[in-house]
């Protein structure tokens, strides 16, 4: 068995992780409930601490649920052991069940607290998220968390025991129907722990008288009993091995209780999580008085060692009277309350352990959750700020657009007023111009007749102008052709003059050559005569010089003459042949030049004729283009006149008024 360690619960979640608290002092609920000894021996002495603040709300109301079987009004109460009223409570290992982990605890919490909570064989029972009273269904082991409500002290007084227990007894009888239904009948498999134990326990009035001789309770005891919540159980497992009103103890190795199939609940169910803390706030005096009240039936037990030195039980009482019957009924109720409180204590122990574990897990999770909440809040604040800035920007833009639209609307209104004024002005002008328009129409009709006459004259003048223009163009073309022919003839004349000058130059050159040839021929004739004279002189025997060539001296005279004549005649013939060749060469060169001159003249003549033909064709094309342009202009003018006449007809004029250029009209002689 282990001591339940309760933690103070602050109103605001702490940022630090939950640390292991010291061993707290238990309230007066533990002192009013007779404790059960440990399986191995008596409970060791433990020091008491200052009672912690009560954070859990006291469960108010009457006991719900009833006994299914009746029992005798004054059952025999066997001797039972009494435990001194201590301010601590043991965790009930007998009713520890293998329940799933609490929804508010993490998955790894049982592993983290395995060493710290080694006395528990399984995870704590579930917490119901909705607080409330105990329900009849004991099959599900669930604990409902409740709000914290401290115990309010009642005014001091000394009420009698019937007056102290009267309201609750009346509530029980009112909810159950009758005392016979509460205590009568045999116990069934699903009856409560008090009804099952009451069938085997005799009632000792002497124990009641010795336990509470004055019939009064102290303030702390009364407050403790009055602050106890109503509790309804579906029954506990009856056993013949457990003496008194104690619940069966299975021990650490026997496992959980049997299931609902045997009519026994699996453990305490639907108890408030703050009952143990609220019961710890009562004083020690109430604990001693309640211990005397609840321990009266156990003084007769020979094995009782926790009650201390007390007086022996008195002799059996006489036959029960009304008062004795009332005392019996009240003691039976008190025994039932003791059984209920015992089961409530077990439930509160397990609930407190589960609440401690859940609170420790939640307290460890709180800093992270607070950081997450702070980060989420910061992100939400940033998003809200951004959204607010965006909304402000949109509002500013919409305001600007609204102002701009208002300005545009005002401007449009002004423009509308101006247009309305202009429309009114136009209407007035139209009314004023109506008669003037009629006069203008008559004037236009008169002018249209004059214009038609002027138009006819203009057409005639334009036809004459076109004819004169065509004649002028023809004359210009003829002039151009004449000028071109003149230029051609002048060019031809210049070419002929140049050719003549070239011929003259060639003739001069030829005459100069001929003169030179003649001079050379004269010179050759003179040389020939001179040579003839020399030859005649040579025919005479020459006088030998004083010094002659010995070879010539040996030669005869005839040989000398023949040799001299042969040398002179050979040189002349060579010169004549050379002159003949030069003359033939000059003749051939002159013929070639004459042929080239003739070819060039023919090519120039052909090119001149081709240029003349191209110029004539170009002039003819120019004349045709000019005539075509004039024709197109006339057609365009005719179409424009027809269009103007159609427009005037559409306007409603009697006679169309052709549009005539004023310059042409003024330039035309009427």
Swiss-Prot record:
Compartments in which it is found: Cytoplasm; Cytoplasm, Cytoskeleton, Microtubule organizing center, Centrosome
Coiled coil spans: 329-650
Keywords: Cell cycle, Cell division, Coiled coil, Cytoplasm, Cytoskeleton, Microtubule, Mitosis, Phosphoprotein, Wnt signaling pathway
Positions of the UniProt region annotated as Required for centrosomal localization: 1-333
Compositionally biased region (Pro residues): 311-321
Biased composition range(s): Low complexity: 187-199, 242-251, 260-310
Any one Pfam family match given in the protein's UniProt record, by short name: Fez1
Region feature (Sufficient for interaction with KATNB1 and for inhibition of katanin-mediated microtubule severing): 451-670
One GO CC term on file: midbody
Family in the record: Belongs to the LZTS2 family.
GO biological process terms on file: fibroblast proliferation; kidney development; microtubule severing; mitotic cytokinesis; negative regulation of canonical Wnt signaling pathway; negative regulation of fibroblast proliferation; negative regulation of protein localization to nucleus; negative regulation of Wnt signaling pathway
Residue numbers covered by motif Nuclear export signal: 632-641
Modification type Phosphoserine: residues: 249, 296, 571
General function of this protein: Negative regulator of katanin-mediated microtubule severing and release from the centrosome. Required for central spindle formation and the completion of cytokinesis. May negatively regulate axonal outgrowth by preventing the formation of microtubule bundles that are necessary for transport within the elongating axon. Negative regulator of the Wnt signaling pathway. Represses beta-catenin-mediated transcriptional activation by promoting the nuclear exclusion of beta-catenin.
Main location, first listed in the record: cytoplasm
Region (Sufficient for interaction with CTNNB1): 448-670
Subunit structure: Interacts with CTNNB1. Interacts with KATNB1. Also interacts with gamma-tubulin and KIF23.
Biased composition annotated in UniProt, kind: Polar residues: 213-233
Region: Disordered, residue numbers: 1-52, 92-131, 150-323
Domain of life: Eukaryota
Protein name stated in the entry: Leucine zipper putative tumor suppressor 2
